[in-house]
Design a protein with these regions (language model features):
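Extreme N-terminal starter segment of soluble prokaryotic enzymes
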Residues: 2-8
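Short, basic/aromatic-enriched C-terminal tail that caps enzymatic domains
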Residues: 235-260
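CN hydrolase (nitrilase-like) catalytic-core segments centered on the catalytic cysteine
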Residues: 64-81, 153-235
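Active-site catalytic loop in hydrolytic enzyme cores
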Residues: 90-164, 178-185, 245, 249-252
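Structural motif
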Residues: 39-40, 145, 168
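Cys-nucleophile CN-hydrolase/nitrilase-fold catalytic domain and related Cys-dependent amidase chemistry
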Residues: 19-20, 24-107, 113, 176-196
């Protein structure tokens, strides 16, 4: 029988430059999701600090916030995808920062690290963070997925590059309310054009002078909305068989050719 994956959309108000507050809120979300039998919980971009250009907020992959998130995942036996600003060494041995999406296994160990490929020059992100060079495809309970971060959403070629290899795309973001209509449209478009599930998790609240109003959502491979209403932590089920059925009936991806 084809495996399915229950994913929780962990939207919350991130504490600005306040990992203690942020991690406490994240724990509430994760524990609530576990009660709903979620196997994967998705948290927003930079989920411990908010979207910040303060290099001092970044931490190494073995830093305290990451250790806390790993322990949290292990304590409730869920996998956890969380956005963190990380500090690491470049191949040349220099210190560099990345806006990352990190997948923790249900044993608390880091399973995958995706680095945001398109940094947001409009906000000065390009002056602080080094862009990632490649997509990351991983598997959670037999379901193939690729994580992306916020501004990546505006570049459809990034998603098309992995479409045939995944069942789901997961987007984590700090997407301001002022551009919410773009978020709503682009998230759904990525599901329709790539014929796969899309799970997109945004934050709420205030941070860095900006207002965030959530809008976390999930769509099936036909672009139909899946996000339940009236629950604090919504969950959706990813079914690879549905992806195959849509692609077999409407084999649009077979006709794809890269532009000359």
């Amino acid at each position: 029988m084809t495996p399915t994956l229950r994913v929780a959309l962990g939207e919350y108000d991130t504490g600005w430059h306040d990992p203690v507050v942020s991690l406490a809120r994240a724990e509430e979300v994760v524990r609530s999701a576990a009660v709903s039998d979620a196997a994967l919980v998705v948290l927003p971009e930079m989920c411990t600090t908010g979207f910040t250009m303060d290099a001092a907020q970044a931490e190494p992959l073995d830093g305290p916030a990451l250790r806390t998130l790993g322990r949290l995942a292990a304590s409730v036996r869920v996998q956890l995808l969380a956005g963190i600003a990380i500090q690491e060494r470049s191949p040349e041995g220099k210190t560099q920062l990345a806006n990352a999406a990190i997948l923790f296994g249900d044993d608390g160990r880091t399973r995958a690290v995706y680095r945001k490929q398109r940094v947001f020059a409009y906000a000065g992100e390009d002056a602080v963070y080094t862009p990632g060079r490649a997509a990351v495809i991983t598997e959670v309970n037999g379901v193939r997925l690729a994580p992306f971060v916020c501004y990546d959403l505006r570049f459809p070629e990034l998603f098309r590059a992995v479409a045939r290899e995944v069942d789901a795309i997961v987007i984590i973001a700090n997407w301001p309310a002022a551009r919410r209509s773009h978020w709503d449209t682009l998230v759904r478009a990525r599901a329709i054009e790539n014929q796969c599930y899309v799970v997109a998790v945004n934050r709420t609240g205030l941070g860095g002078g900006l207002t965030y109003d959530g809008g976390s959502a999930a769509y099936d491979p036909w672009g139909e909305p899946l996000t339940p209403t009236g629950v604090s932590v919504p969950c959706v089920d990813i079914d690879p068989a549905r992806v195959r059925a849509v692609r077999d009936e409407y084999p649009f991806l077979r006709d794809y050719r890269a532009a000359p």
